Swiss-Prot record:
Family: Belongs to the FKBP-type PPIase family. Tig subfamily.
Ranges annotated as spanning the membrane: none
Species per Swiss-Prot/TrEMBL record: Clostridium botulinum (strain Hall / ATCC 3502 / NCTC 13319 / Type A)
Primary localization: cytoplasm
Record's subcellular location: Cytoplasm
Catalytic reaction annotation: [protein]-peptidylproline (omega=180) = [protein]-peptidylproline (omega=0)
UniProt-listed Enzyme Commission number(s): 5.2.1.8
SUPFAM superfamilies tied to this protein: FKBP-like, Triger factor/SurA peptide-binding domain-like, Trigger factor ribosome-binding domain
Protein name, per record: Trigger factor
UniProt note: domains: Consists of 3 domains; the N-terminus binds the ribosome, the middle domain has PPIase activity, while the C-terminus has intrinsic chaperone activity on its own.
Amino acid sequence: MNVKVENIEKNVVKLEITVDSEKFNEAVKKSFKKNAKRFNVPGFRKGKAPLNIIKKYYGEGVLFEDAINFCCEDTYPKAIEENNIKPVDYPQIDVVQIGEGKDFIYTAEVTTVPEVKLGEYKGVEVKKVSYEVEDEAVENELKSMQEKNARVSLKEEGEIEKGNIAIIDFKGYVDGKAFEGGEAKDYEIEIGSGTFIGDFEDQLVGLKKDESKEVNVSFPEEYGREDLNGKPATFEVTIKDIKVKELPALDDEFAKEVSEFDTLEELKSDIKDRMKKELSEKAKAEYEEAVVEAVGANAEIEIPKVMIEKEIENMVRDLEMRLKYQGLDLKSYYEFTNSSEEKVKEYMRETAEKRVKTDLIMQEIAKVEDIKATEEELKEKAMEVAKQYGQKDVEKTAELIANAQKAYLEIDIVNGKVLDLLVESSKEIA
């Protein structure tokens, strides 16, 4: 095998790879062995015609497609390894010379990992991030707990008031016609919750059980459905029942009922402690992100478009998986958000570019600092991931993960170590 390397443009190289005729003939024989059964030659049972007859009957090129694949699969990986080329995508293969008794020559054009010029990455100055737990936040959490533990009962007499729950039948019309999704029976709505569009809920205040009313509202301009965006609508509404919510008193008895604590003050203290922990984790994550951004601002990288496109595809696949868990698919997501595949991908582009840049910088720092993942760390990370799957045999699952996802585990561990280095060496400023 002979290899010539030519730099076509920044981050794009073309390899001209020559496979000697003997090796190519072996690939042709291998192709014949694979495809022999599909050839039908008069005078021979199907699949029994010898190689020389097949070539004569079908032409020598009939076996070239698989022969080319065999040659490329064997020589391309060796060529990029020997020439220290790190591709980021599949190569564009073009045949230069092919024929019986000739050397097989092909070119492979491929985009490579870009050069990363690191600036200062140790000791970057980053503004301190901190959060305080507000008393209002604690009170809001208590109110939420009150709501969850409210007693709901039928309101036998009287009108709908704010805070009541109305059980309604409704049917909506736009331009005088009923529209899809605009009808429901025995629908529960809390008055004042803002669940419905416009002042729909306010217009129900004062109605009694079994009364009906025509409610007029307008859909928001960006409601998410082209047939409804910004349009006025009329709803025929009938009150089936009215319920009233009775909130429990915020006292020691409430604390005992909803928690492990004996007093309301103990419950408040626990809520505050949990919020402090959450805000501390939030501050830590934001500080780490700011450190990485500062390091990124000091670096110079010209990211190939193909790397960004690949990351966008990964993000779309992740979105598709998350939607699947919710019983949805991409098509319904695009319809619900009044979007499209093109719009979503464009929205993801900035984040994708940021992710690619961060990964490249982390890899370069790891290389400069000689940061690697140890076998022990790989085992620990695999065990950590395995526990998340909830399998009975955690150790066996961890072993499978360590083998199947070793490269991903290594990247995760190394990136974590690099992040620790960057954060520990950073300077926190007020």
